[in-house]
Amino acid sequence: MAWTEKDVENGKESESLGNNGFLKGGQSSSGSKGSPGRISHVKKIFEDKDAITYANILRSRNKFVDALAIYESVLEKDSKSIESLIGKGICLQMQNTGRLAFESFSEAIKVDPQNACALTHCGILYKDEGRLVEAAESYEKALKADPSYTPAAECLAIVLTDIGTSLKLAGNTQEGIQKYYEAIKIDSHYAPAYYNLGVVYSEMMQYDMALNCYEKAALERPMYAEAYCNMGVIFKNRGDLESAIACYERCLAVSPNFEIAKNNMAIALTDLGTKVKLEGDINQGVAYYKKALCYNWHYADAMYNLGVAYGEMLKFDMAIVFYELAFHFNPHCAEACNNLGVIYKDRDNLDKAVECYQLALSIKPNFSQSLNNLGVVYTVQGKMDAAASMIEKAIIANPTYAEAYNNLGVLYRDAGNISLAIEAYEQCLKIDPDSRNAGQNRLLAMNYINEGTDDKLYEAHRDWGRRFMKLYPQYTSWDNSKVPERPLVIGYVSPDYFTHSVSYFIEAPLAHHDYTNYKVVVYSSVVKADAKTNRFRDKVMKKGGLWRDIYGIDEKKVSSMIREDKVDIMVELTGHTANNKLGTMACRPAPVQVTWIGYPNTTGLPTIDYRITDAMADPPNAKQKHVEELVRLPNSFLCYTPSPEAGPVCPAPALSNGFVTFGSFNNLAKITPKVLKVWARILSAVPHSRLIVKCKPFCCDSVRQRFLSILEQLGLEPQRVDLLPLILLNHDHMQAYSLMDISLDTFPYAGTTTTCESLYMGVPCVTMGGSVHAHNVGVSLLKTVGLENLVARNEDEYVESAIQLASDVTSLSNLRMSLRELMSKSPLCDGAKFTRNIESIYRSMWRRYCDGDVPSLRRMELLQQQQTQTESVVPEESSVNPSERTITSAPTDGSIKENGFTAVPALALKSSTSEENGVQSNHNGNHGNLS
C-alpha cells in the first residue's frame, strides 16, 4: 500500500500511549496482558535486555533516533524480538515514516499474530491515513486477540465515532447513529460518542434525547466544554435562559477562551435582559445587556437593546451612543438606524432623522417602519406628496400595518381631506381595534365636520370611553380628608407645557393661583422642553408648587404618583389630542376629575366628573350632549396670556395697499369646502380684496393647487390668493398678522389660539355661532373682549359682517390700533380674576365631593347596573356588535407597541402619529453545535 508521510495526530489515539511510547498494557507474544512487547519464552542475554530497556528510556525522552539505533542493533541479533519490533515501529511512526513503521508492526504481527499492541498500532496508522474501515478492522482483531485490552477498545470507539460522523455528514444519519451506539457499546465511557449523538439528536430536534447525551458526555468527561456549551443552546432555545447561562458558565470555567461559548453567553444574557425588561425591571435588563458585552464586546444586538432600554429610560444621549455602536458592529442593523431617526425627529432635527430613515431603507428597502417614519417626518414638514408616497409604500410592504393607516389619516387630515382621514382611521381600527391612536384621531377628525345635527359624535365618544375605561382599574376610595374649606391640592396634567397653543391658556392659573389654599402640582409629559417649559417650572416651584416630569412613564404609575401627592382635584388639559393621559384619568386617581381647555368636546370617559366651559361656548339650552357634567365660568372658559415675542401692532395693510386683505392662519382641516364657499362670497363682494391663508401643507405644490382649484371653482381667481407655509419662529408667525386686515374664522370648528393672536395683533376676527362647543369658541372669545358685533348667527350675517368691516378702512384702522388695549383690559386677559373664578369652581366641586355628590361614581354605578342587567339576559343568538367590542389587551398609548416613541404634529389640536422602533432584540448567533 502507498503511505503518506505525515505527523501522527495528537488526538485521542496518541493519548493512549504509555510513558515509554507503547500503548498502555502492551501484549506479549502469547496475547496475554503484561509488559509491552515483553517475550517471556525466549531467553535473551543480559546485554540485549539491558539495551532494550535503555532504548525504551530514550524513546520516552523523545530521542527516537538513538532509540531506533539500539532497537535495530538488537534486531540484528534477534530479528523476532517483539519488543524491539514494536519499539522500532513507534520510533519510525514518531519520525513521520509511516510506511516503515507499518512494516515493523507487520513483522511483529508475523511473529505473534495475536499481538494486540501491534495490531492496535497498525490501526492507528490506518486511521492516520483516513482509512477508517481498515483501522476499525485492525482494532477489532486486537480485541479479538485480547478482549480485555483497553487501548484497542478506546481506539475502536474513537474510529467508530469518526465513521459515524462521516456517515452523518454524507446524509446517512441513521447509520451514523448506529456507529455512535456501537462505539458506546465498545467503550461505555467514551464521552465524544455521547456528545456526537447529542449533536445528531439536536439537529433532529429531539432535544430531550440530545440533552441526555450531552449530560452523559459531561459525566464521563467533566472538562468537556463543548458538551456544556451545547446543553446551554438547548436550554436557551427552550426559553430557560437561567439554565442556559449556568451551562455556559460551566463551559467557560473549563475553557475560558472558548469563543463560541462566549458568544452564546452574550446571546443568552441579551435575551435575559429583554425578558426582565419586559417584566418591568429595566435596570436589571440594562445590567444583563452590559454583562453580555463583557463576553462579546462587539455583540451588536446587546448594543441595540441597550439603545432601546436607554430610550425607554429617556436617556437619549446614551441611546444614540449604543444605536451607533450597534450599527458600527452590524452595518445591516436597519433597526438601529430607524431608532436613531426617531430620537432625532423628537429633537426636531428632522434632516438628521430623514438621513437615518433613508439609511435604514438602503439596508432594508421594504422596511415598513422606516417607510412609515419617513412619511411621518414629511407630514410634519408639510411635504404631503412625499409623505403619502412613503406611507403607501409602508402599507404595500406590510398590508396589516395598522399604524400606517393611522398616519395616512393624519396626512389626509393635515391636507384638509377629513372624509379620507376618517376612512383611513377606520381602516386602522379594522386591523387593530385596540389602536388608541386611530380611535382618538377619528374622534378628533369628526369635530371638523360636526354641526350638531345629530348625536353621532357624542355616541362615538361615549362608546370609546366605555371601552377604554375597561383597560384600567379604577380607584373608588381616597384618603383625602373630606373637609370642605381646607386647602386643596390641584393637579394639572398635560404634554403641552411648552410653546404650544394650550400653554397660552394654562399660564394664568399657574401664575395666579393662591398656592396657600390651592397648591398646584404639575404633571408634565412634554416631549421636548423649551424656554417656556423652564419658565413655567420655575414659576410653579417658586410659588411652592410641585413639578413632576412624567414623559415616558406608564399611565398607571402616574396614577400612583397622583395618589401619593394627595391631589384633590385632577385637571387634564389635552382630551383626545396627542400624548394625552386619559389612561391616567381612566384610573380615577383623584377624588374629583376635570377636563378643560385642550379638546372641544366630551372626552367620553365616565371617570371624569366635570368639563369646564362657559355659557357662550355651551349655552344652557344647547342640545349637545357630554358624558361629563358641564360647569360654566362666568366669562369665557379661556384666559389668554399673550406671547412676549408678539411685537408691536402694525398699521392696517389696507392703508398702504389700497385694498383689504382677509386672512386665516387656522389649520387646513378647519377650512372645509363649506368655509371656502362663504369666503369666496365675501371676496367677490369686496372689490380688489385678497385672501391670505397660512398653514403647514402649503409647502406642497399639489395641496396648493388643490386649494386654489376649489376657490377658482367658487369664482375666486387664484391670483387674488396668497398661500403661506408654516412659519417656524413664533415672532415671525405673530408678525405675519401684519399682512391681513380682517381675520375670517372657520366653522363648524372655530379657531382658538389663532383668534386670540389675531385680536392681540390688532386684526378683528369675524366668527359665527353654532350648535356645538367647537363652533362657539370664537363666540366666547369675541364676546368676552367686547366685539359682539363681529359674532354672526348664520352664514349671511357672517358675510355681511365681513363686508361691513371692509367697507370703512378708516374705522378698520382705528379698531386695529385700539384692539390690543381693548383685549388686554378685558376678562380674556385678566389672569388674576379668571383664576379666582376657577378656584371658586374648584371649591364648589370639592364641597359636592365632601357631601357625597360625585358625578363620575354615579355614572360608573349606573354603567355597572346596566352591564349586570345585560349579562343576566340570555339572547337566542349570540352576536358581536363591533361598536361595543370589549378591548382586552393593553393600548399602544399613542406609540409603537415595542418602544413607546410618538411623533406629534405641532398644531393647536393635534393628531397622534406613530413611529416604530424595530424589534426589541435580534437573537441571531452561533448556537455552538460542535461535532
From Swiss-Prot:
Record's compositionally biased regions (Basic and acidic residues): 1-15
Coiled-coil intervals: none
One record GO biological process: cytokinin-activated signaling pathway
Catalytic activity as recorded in UniProt: L-seryl-[protein] + UDP-N-acetyl-alpha-D-glucosamine = 3-O-(N-acetyl-beta-D-glucosaminyl)-L-seryl-[protein] + UDP + H(+); L-threonyl-[protein] + UDP-N-acetyl-alpha-D-glucosamine = 3-O-(N-acetyl-beta-D-glucosaminyl)-L-threonyl-[protein] + UDP + H(+)
Each TPR repeat, start to end: 48-81, 82-115, 116-149, 157-190, 191-224, 225-258, 266-299, 300-333, 334-367, 369-401, 402-435
Recorded superkingdom: Eukaryota
Molecular function via GO: peptide-O-fucosyltransferase activity; protein O-acetylglucosaminyltransferase activity
Residue ranges of the region described as Catalytic region: 436-931
InterPro entries: Glycosyltr_41/O-GlcNAc_trsf, OGT/SEC/SPY_C, Sel1-like, TPR-like_helical_dom_sf, TPR_rpt
Subcellular location: Nucleus
One Pfam assignment: TPR_8
Annotated metabolic or biological route of this protein: Protein modification; protein glycosylation
Keyword Glycosyltransferase in record: yes
Listed name of the protein: Probable UDP-N-acetylglucosamine--peptide N-acetylglucosaminyltransferase SPINDLY
Species for this entry: Solanum lycopersicum
Lineage of source species: Eukaryota, Viridiplantae, Streptophyta, Embryophyta, Tracheophyta
